[in-house]
């Protein structure tokens, strides 16, 4: 049986692949984001906090692969969407990537000194590294559902006509909060 590889078939295949990658990221890294977002609140003692970190430590680096592959799939299948979203939402992407970088740094440096103040600061850095991406990913879904203010010029170049604060509209925040809630309720 020959599979037709026309445009419609390829589009369905790419949507399925992208959906699988993003769902894989949400399921696997959502647990890690939830642990990080609840770090200052779930452990009463340093030992309880170390146990929470050790629950995700063996796998959290591998979970990031889903996110990287999702970005690569968007680039491969829809380069125009990739270019528009990554240039228009540059500051939001920078915010998310900074928080995603802060999380592994916090994992690494939290245990370097036994000082409680040192560990508390890194626990709050872990909180930021888990809270911000979960919220901003939910806000991104809200902006996709709501529609972002893009326009095309006469040469079909896209321009984003909004601002970073404009991305955090009430509707987008109301979709961001369930995104955050889904990451932290996995632990309950």
Residue ranges of predicted features:
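N-terminal signal-anchor module of multipass membrane proteins
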Residues: 1-62, 68-71
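Helix-coil boundary and interhelical linker segments in multi-pass alpha-helical membrane proteins
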Residues: 1-15, 75-90, 145-155, 163-173
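Alpha-helical transmembrane segments
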Residues: 14-25, 86-100, 127-131, 166-182
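Membrane-water interface of transmembrane alpha-helices
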Residues: 28-29, 33-38, 97-110, 182-188
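Hydrophobic alpha-helical segments
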Residues: 43-46, 75-77, 102, 186
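Membrane-interface helix-loop-helix modules in multi-pass inner-membrane proteins
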Residues: 59-132, 148-151
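Long, contiguous internal "core" modules enriched in hydrophobic/ aromatic residues
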Residues: 109-188
